[in-house]
Amino acid sequence: APLISPEHFNTFINPYNRKLVDRARQLGLRVVRHSDGNLWSLMDVLLASGYDGLNPLEPHAGMALKKVKAYCGDRICLLGNIDCVELLPDGTPQQVDTAVKQAIEDAADGGGLIICSSNSLHPGVNPENCIAMFEATKKYGSYEA
């Protein structure tokens, strides 16, 4: 959960976020919101704030990709959800391949999905698993034009 209540977020944080997003849009830029943890209590305000993307979508924090996609639809691009807590450090390349395939099945419909780690590619991530994530994304993640 966020460190502050949704009410305080709306009062003290989001007005400034909106100004940043609006200015970026005036400059022709896209804006991705990076916010760790469980974002459900802020999801509606984040969607209304005009962000183009939401990152990192941590499965260990309750941000199941299929559920987030069902809720958000095509209103925002989703980035992340390949577990960097256990899977990328300690899993096998085959397990990573399976997780990427599942993420794409869960959230690629209609576009708006960028596969990446659920937070970062930190020093504990097994390089072979990082490569497996990239390769699986290429294998399963192309859209037919």
Regions found by a protein language model. Name each.
Residues 1-145:
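Active-site loop segments of alpha/beta catalytic cores
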